[in-house]
């Protein structure tokens, strides 16, 4: 991995979850990895992240990740309909960092981060529901996404299939 300093961000034409996207991620610190580096990620330690980056290992897929990938397009459509906007997936780099955005809206200079939990029955998600507090490991991810995309605002959508845009 090599680190270079650039003055501005760059939008990269990559389809998320493609082989080229996985190769791209090996060369950067990704927004979704920032919480692990900071010791905030309950799902991956700094040591595990370092090993994965060093040996260019793919993240082991799990049920929660598959669930999120399956629902994310539906969630983005829901958000776009409710807000009368058109957020699109995008990948940005800035300096040695990269961010794969669930949604980017150029006109409003904003991003969309989507989470599709299987259940709210975890301490992090129950705290979100009860206190409207974004888990710190996702907050760190969103801050890195804002940095990479040079955007001013982020929307954080927590989506489950029973949601509807109807009043």
Identify the role of each PLM range.
Residues 47, 76, 142:
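Generic structural marker for isolated residues within well-ordered, non-membrane alpha-helices
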């Amino acid at each position: 991995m090599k680190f270079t300093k650039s003055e501005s961000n760059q939008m990269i034409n990559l389809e998320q979850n493609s082989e080229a996207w996985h190769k791209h991620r090996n060369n950067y610190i990704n927004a979704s990895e920032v919480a692990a580096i900071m010791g905030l990620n309950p799902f991956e330690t700094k040591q595990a992240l370092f090993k994965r980056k060093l040996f260019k290992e793919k993240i082991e897929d799990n049920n929660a990740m598959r669930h999120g990938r399956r629902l994310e397009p539906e969630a983005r459509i829901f958000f776009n309909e409710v807000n009368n906007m058109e957020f699109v997936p995008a990948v940005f780099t800035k300096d040695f960092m990269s961010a794969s955005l669930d949604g980017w809206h150029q006109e409003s200079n904003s991003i969309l981060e989507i989470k599709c939990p299987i259940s709210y029955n975890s301490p992090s998600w129950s705290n979100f529901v009860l206190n409207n507090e974004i888990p710190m490991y996702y907050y760190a991810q969103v801050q890195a996404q804002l940095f990479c995309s040079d955007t001013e605002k982020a929307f954080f959508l927590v989506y489950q299939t029973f949601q509807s845009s109807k009043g």
